[in-house]
């Protein structure tokens, strides 16, 4: 298993360091891992003059999976667009042909009070949103702003091909098989032809997965149901724009984005794994960042790229034990618990492994 480690910017090096410690512990227990560091984002601009240098491009192409910390920071905002750190992230997604974004939203019992919803509504929350990343209205052509009949008009094209829908549906069905075998497909087929095709193709694809229960929901209802009764969902699959919105909504049900990992996969389940939070330059170097989302990204990598369910579950159990034992970083701290720093949280996870 060859893994590229891209710490990135801001708190990235601190949180990724704890994830690497977890990987090294698994390696010492017999898991065959090869780890290699690379540069992406602002640190790559500083060292190589571009956010996604050739050496990193080669590294990630040869790796089986990539662990990323975070990229960006205000000191790069004045750079030309092509040199901004975020272009490195877009570049790696394109270079690796990543089309499926997996975003879990899990509420740990110990953090139930951190949610903005009542504990009885969100207790037991464990959702996986599978979002298509490369199509839809974000990338459809034609698009633009132009002058017509004396006034400006803006237009975009919402478009999906049958092949694009089928491949993301298969990712979602396979993910559902690893969980409770329930999949909800979200669309707006009552007014949008592109999502009528979405529903048709997902329904056809369900025939390949008779062991998975498929349901459909309109996106406006799904947004409402995520707040009204989020526990009804297990795996949700949807298009790029709807997934962009719903995954952010679901993440806030958990109370802390510092706890949430993500995966972006290609057709062979090679993946880029990263926390959903940003680089938080204001707390960089202060040993206060929460590394648990990055640690949980390692668990996702083991599950979805390497099919190592035992090791993935082992990491997740360790995180649950750390929380049950009362350890908290500043972002999830509450009175009566033990506030600890980034490295100490890494120590606690290793002790629980």
From Swiss-Prot:
Keyword Metal-binding among UniProt keywords: yes
UniProt record similarity statement: Belongs to the isocitrate and isopropylmalate dehydrogenases family. LeuB type 1 subfamily.
Gene3D superfamilies membership: Isopropylmalate Dehydrogenase (3.40.718.10)
HAMAP family: LeuB_type1 (MF_01033)
GO terms, biological process: L-leucine biosynthetic process
This protein's record includes keyword S-adenosyl-L-methionine: no
A Pfam family this chain is assigned to: Iso_dh
Compartments where located: Cytoplasm
Keyword line: Amino-acid biosynthesis, Branched-chain amino acid biosynthesis, Cytoplasm, Leucine biosynthesis, Magnesium, Manganese, Metal-binding, NAD, Oxidoreductase
Name this polypeptide is given: 3-isopropylmalate dehydrogenase
């Amino acid at each position: 298993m060859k893994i590229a480690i891209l710490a990135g910017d801001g708190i990235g090096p601190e949180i990724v360091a704890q994830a690497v410690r977890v990987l090294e512990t698994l390696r010492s227990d017999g898991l065959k891992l090869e780890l290699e560091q690379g540069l992406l984002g602002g640190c790559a601009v500083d060292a190589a003059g571009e956010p996604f240098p050739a050496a990193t491009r080669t590294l990630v192409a040869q790796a089986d999976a990539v662990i990323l910390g975070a990229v960006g920071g205000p000191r790069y905002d004045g750079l030309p667009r092509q040199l901004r750190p975020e272009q490195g992230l877009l570049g790696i997604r394109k270079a690796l042909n990543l089309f499926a974004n997996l975003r879990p939203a899990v509420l740990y019992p110990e953090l139930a009070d951190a949610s903005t919803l009542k504990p009885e509504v969100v207790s037991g929350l464990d959702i996986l949103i599978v979002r298509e990343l490369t199509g839809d209205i974000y990338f459809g052509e034609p698009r633009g702003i132009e002058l017509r009949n004396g006034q400006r008009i803006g237009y975009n094209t919402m478009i999906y091909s049958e092949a694009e829908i089928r491949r993301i549906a298969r990712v979602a069905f396979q993910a559902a098989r690893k969980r409770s075998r329930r999949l909800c497909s979200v669309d707006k087929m009552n007014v949008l032809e592109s999502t009528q095709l979405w529903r048709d193709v997902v329904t056809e694809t369900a025939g390949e997965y008779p062991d998975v229960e498929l349901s459909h929901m309109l996106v406006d209802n799904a947004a409402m149901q995520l707040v009204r009764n989020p526990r009804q969902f297990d795996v949700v699959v949807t298009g790029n724009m709807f997934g962009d919105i719903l995954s952010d909504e679901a993440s806030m049900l958990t109370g802390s984005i510092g706890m949430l990992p993500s995966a972006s996969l290609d057709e062979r389940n090679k993946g880029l794994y990263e926390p959903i939070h940003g680089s938080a330059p204001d707390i960089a170097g202060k040993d206060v960042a929460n590394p648990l989302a990055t640690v949980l990204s390692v668990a996702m990598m083991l599950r979805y790229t390497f099919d190592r369910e035992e090791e993935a579950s082992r990491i997740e159990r360790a995180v649950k034990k750390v929380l049950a034992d009362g350890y908290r970083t500043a972002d999830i701290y509450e009175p009566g618990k033990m506030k600890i720093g980034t490295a100490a949280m890494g120590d606690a996870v290793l002790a629980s492994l």
